[in-house]
Amino acid sequence: GAFNDTTWRNMSTSSVWAQFYEGSNVFTIFEPNDSNCTSNSSTNLYNIPGLDHMCLYDSSSIRDYARLAYGTTYDKRGPLLRNNLVMFYNTTLDNGVEAYSELSYYKSDSSKQLYGGAPLGMGTSAKNGGNTQPILVPSTNYWLNQLQRPNGDLFVDKEGDELWFRRFRFSTPRSWDSTRETWRVVQGFRGEWNSWDWDSGIVVSRATSEMDNHGRQSMTLLNAALADSTPNAYNPFCAGVGCNEEAFTVSIFRNNTTELFSADLKMSNDSVFSMPAGDVGMLVGAEVRKETMDDARDPRINGTIVYSTPPQAANQSTFPYISDIVNSSPSPNTYGERVVTSLFSELQIPLATNLDSQLAVRAENSDDYGSNVVGKFALGWEPTSWGKLRASTSTSFRAPNLITVNEGLVVRNNSQEDALLTAALGEEYPSGYSIQRVAQGNDDLEAEEATNSSVGFVLTPGDNLIVTVDKWEIATENTIGLFGERNHILLDTLIRSRGGVNECVGNPNVIRGDFIEDNDPESDTYNANWNPNLCKAGNVVRVNDTYLNLDNRTLKGTDYAIEYSVDTDAGSFSAKFMRVQFDEFLQEASGPMAELVAASGAGGPLEGLI
């Protein structure tokens, strides 16, 4: 039938029924009643005396029962408790000035249980310890030395004295507890001075988030438990029973704090001066704002406790490219702050009896990303009592957030297709695997800038009916983002394709391992048919990516709205229909991105790879 495949299975091949590499051979743990386990005369079969719930067999097959069903221990939604407190106090002082105060507090407590963690990069890349978090079962492991054939021959004598994990997941479920608190204090004053209304106030806010993660595994402690030569050693062949995971199971934390201080003064006058069509209104103001953020990570994540891959591993790595926690990428502590000062003004100018205009300007200076000046001009013409035409043009900016400016080296794992392997070995080659992306903040970032324009009309054919249509366009420059792992790998493939067999460097932001020959036609990583026009290269170890100001972007659209309201003896009722239509989305390719687009065309070196 239509659903008779694995598409809807939503299960993981990484489970407690582990797989291991011994050289190029794959050994898998099976249930005792599996056909592989009942082959008592087979030289490919191994058991551990006293463990009757498993066997180890020389096979890469993954049975249905060996796939993890996430829902076994996973909470779709854990308990959540929220508390809010908001208090207001307004009063008028003896001098006529109004004072207003606000105090608010928010707290939430939540928790959730997940499933066991799996090391990063499990799969074919784990051969010889080439994955992100390679795990070695060393020759000293007690349980490895207990594996034996039905005739008593030991695994370490007949196969090898060490194994690499290929697919695996710990049996201890992960979980987390989270507490978040936010408080805010506002104190303001408003009054009149001559013909001006004024309003001034301060805002102080602080938010904290404390999260504890449980059921996590330390790579350092795990290696020590695997190296143990006593029955207290971690048993990698346990299939979820009597594994001895307690010795390396730990809890870790992440604590975040953000703070905001803001003070401002605004003054407005409905009639600064008069024109033939009416009075001109004006608003002026100033603001100073300080923002801080502090992201504190656990010592096993931030590099205080440093983990390095085993010396036998093909992937030789350490912090900041890997952390000491299974299934977690490294993240440094991050701190950032900025002080922003702003001046702004606005004019409401009547140009004719039925023609109004608005003019606004805002200048802002930040001590990290620089200065910006933006403005707005708008017109509203009402030729009849039931119709109005309106148009506006403005400039705006979006500041880079504190993380994109201040973040240190942050490594994340994502599954990506390696275009070079596809180009060199064909579309049938399994070119998708886990790749590290190394991102970093950039203190040279500029704010995104945009030009916004719109034109439309408002119709009020009756007292209770309003119809609006607006055509708009947003053109953005210096969009902030990452070039992306896939684009970096495509650029690497393009450079190598253009350079031929002598181009062995490619994109310097793509770090590749050594090429490992596999001449076994039965192997899923067979590569003896490598394209002779390309320099041989190994899998991508990591891709270096930095936040940048990227390409220009244009977005066009049309907004429609119809609103009808009616008053009755039973109350007031209203209905509103809104539609947002995107007419065009255009992102201009520039620099390396333009090269990729050009190379992906018919006959180009990247044809069929994008």
Task: Specify the residue positions occupied by each region the protein language model found.
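Residue-level signature of outer-membrane beta-barrel architecture
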Residues: Y89-T91, G191-W193, N269-F273, S345, ...
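Conserved C-terminal beta-signal and adjacent last beta-strands/turns
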Residues: S178, T558-E584, P605-I610
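Surface-exposed, low-complexity loop segments enriched in small/polar and acidic residues
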Residues: V26-L80, V86-F88, G96-V340, D368, ...
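Solvent-exposed loop/turn segments connecting transmembrane beta-strands
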Residues: E337, E364-V373, T451, I562
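Transmembrane beta-strand segments that form the barrel wall of outer-membrane beta-barrel proteins
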Residues: L355-D367, L379, L389-T393
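Transmembrane beta-strands of outer-membrane beta-barrel proteins
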Residues: G1, A99-S101, W198-S200, V280-A286, ...
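Outer-membrane beta-barrel channels and translocator barrels
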Residues: L80, T92-D94, W193-N194, V272-A277, ...
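Feature captures outer-membrane beta-barrel proteins of Gram-negative bacteria and organelles
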Residues: L222, L343-S345, V373-T384, V455
